[in-house]
From Swiss-Prot:
This is Beta-pompilidotoxin. GO terms for molecular function: sodium channel regulator activity; toxin activity. It comes from the Eukaryota. Inhibits sodium channel (Nav) inactivation. Shows two types of inhibitory activities on channels. Inhibition of insect DmNav1/para and hNav1.6/SCN8A shows a large increase in the steady-state current component without any increase in the slow component, whereas inhibition of hNav1.1/SCN1A, hNav1.2/SCN2A, hNav1.3/SCN3A and hNav1.7/SCN9A shows a large increase in the slow component with only a small steady-state component. Is 5-fold more potent than alpha-PMTX for inducing repetitive action potentials in lobster neuromuscular junctions. The modification Leucine amide is found at L13. One of its GO terms (cellular component) is host cell presynaptic membrane. Keywords: Amidation, Ion channel impairing toxin, Neurotoxin, Presynaptic neurotoxin, Secreted, Toxin, Voltage-gated sodium channel impairing toxin. It is found in: Secreted. The keyword Secreted applies. Expressed by the venom gland. Changing K3R: Similar order of inhibition potency on different Nav isoforms; alone or.
Length: 13
C-alpha cells in the first residue's frame, strides 16, 4: 500500500 508508506515516514519522525 502507498498510504502506509506515508504513515511510516511520519512515524519515523
Amino acid at each position: 500500500r502507498i498510504k502506509i508508506g506515508l504513515f511510516d515516514q511520519l512515524s519515523r519522525l
